[in-house]
Amino acid sequence: MVSISNVSRGAIIRWNGAPHSIESLVHRTPGNLRAFYQASMKNLKTGRNVEYRFSATEQVDVIVTERKKYQYLYRDGEDYVMMDTETFDQINVPEVAIGPASRFLKDSVMVDIVFADDGSILEVELPTFVELEVTETSPASKDDRATSGTKPAIVETGAEVNVPMFIQTGSIIRIDTRSGEYMERVKK
């Protein structure tokens, strides 16, 4: 058990019987009241975000984790099959461990898998940016290229992303996997 004051952003704690990742932790001392820590956490079992106010003296259980590089191979029903690049062992990862970024996962992408001290999978971290090909989008007319609007486009993984008007079918684009937003066109 560790004091909440010694926990930082990115740490994984066991709270209410489930593993939670600390997204943000802010120390507050309001007026005549006692100090507290306002935590924004992500439940790693359900994927839901949770807000909680810890007292400044509260103790939490920090989970010892291990990160390993894996390569995404294919999807098997609800699970994603990943391969350890050193031992070539394959494991099935549930979609909830990857989260909404799973829609940008394409074959052979390297990911970091975070394991708990008991060997269970806590979360899967995709690269911050991925480069995907646009497979379907409406054609741009001459008038559209002069405006700064966006249009929907389907990328090779099947995900829909809003892109600028000048992007055409066949273009390679860079996408931020954290927000799902278009970043730039890749010139190859």
UniProtKB/Swiss-Prot annotation:
UniProt keyword list: Cytoplasm, Elongation factor, Protein biosynthesis
GO terms for cellular component: cytoplasm
Gene Ontology molecular function, alphabetical: translation elongation factor activity
PROSITE patterns reported for this sequence: EFP
Entry keyword annotation includes Oxidoreductase: no
InterPro entries: Elong-fact-P_C, NA-bd_OB-fold, Rib_uL2_dom2, Transl_elong_fac_P/YeiP, Transl_elong_KOW-like, Transl_elong_P/YeiP_cen, Transl_elong_P/YeiP_CS, Transl_elongation_fac_P
Entry's localization field: Cytoplasm
Primary location group: cytoplasm
rRNA-binding in keyword set: no
Pathway field: Protein biosynthesis; polypeptide chain elongation
Superkingdom to which the source organism belongs: Bacteria
GO biological process, one term: peptide biosynthetic process
Function text: Involved in peptide bond synthesis. Stimulates efficient translation and peptide-bond synthesis on native or reconstituted 70S ribosomes in vitro. Probably functions indirectly by altering the affinity of the ribosome for aminoacyl-tRNA, thus increasing their reactivity as acceptors for peptidyl transferase.
HAMAP family the record matches: EF_P
Entry's family note: Belongs to the elongation factor P family.
Name of the protein in question: Elongation factor P
Origin species: Chlorobaculum tepidum (strain ATCC 49652 / DSM 12025 / NBRC 103806 / TLS)
Biological classification of the source: Bacteria, Pseudomonadati, Chlorobiota, Chlorobiia, Chlorobiales
